[in-house]
A protein has these predicted regions:
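Local sequence-structure signature of Cys/Sec-based thiol-disulfide redox active-site neighborhoods
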Residues: 7-52, 127-142
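Thiol-based oxidoreductase modules, predominantly thioredoxin-like and allied folds used
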Residues: 53-65
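N-terminal beta-loop-helix "entrance" segment that forms/cooperates
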Residues: 34-39, 65-71
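Long, charged amphipathic helices and adjacent flexible linkers at domain junctions
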Residues: 111-129
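Structural micro-motif
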Residues: 22, 66-91
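Contiguous, structured surface segment used for ligand recognition
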Residues: 45, 69, 104
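Non-catalytic, surface beta->alpha helical segment in thiol-disulfide oxidoreductase systems
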Residues: 81-116
């Protein structure tokens, strides 16, 4: 049995039709640290990716694939890296369920284009920043 209902699968499929290019979802798991959560996270990601031919999934083990985890800056599980033609630094820690699920789909859409949807004024302001900014959003399960 899947995580997504038929209604949700239909809605997500429609949203994913907007993908402009390929998206890769790199899932980091580790059975010993968070087995149930990692399995649910992987199942959710595989279900989402199965709804479009533009999404692929790669599952890595945090302990075994340490070099890859370090390269992505991932040090917790479950984790999802959302990549388009390159790594834009989009990470999800924990299972993106509830309201966070829509953010996963939005992240896939943004990664597929390589261009965030920002107002011109926002782009101008961001261009004045002297360096990279690390933005973290924390949420509680819904």
């Amino acid at each position: 049995m899947g995580i997504l209902s038929e209604r949700d699968r239909a809605a997500v499929t429609k949203e994913l039709e907007r993908l402009a290019g390929p998206v890769k979802l790199v899932v980091f798991s580790q059975e010993l640290m968070a087995g149930d959560l990692c399995r649910q996270n992987e199942q959710l990601v595989r279900e989402v990716a199965s709804l479009t031919d533009k999404a692929s999934v790669e599952v890595l083990n945090l302990a075994i694939d340490r070099e890859r985890a370090q390269a992505y800056g991932v040090d917790q599980v479950p984790a999802i890296v959302v990549e388009g033609v390159r790594d834009y630094g989009i990470r999800f820690y924990g299972i993106p369920s509830g309201y966070e699920f829509a953010n996963l789909i939005d992240a896939m859409l943004v990664a597929s284009t390589g261009e965030p949807v920002l107002a011109a004024a926002t782009r101008t302001t961001l261009a004045t920043l002297a360096g990279d900014v690390d933005i973290k959003v924390f949420s509680t399960p819904t």
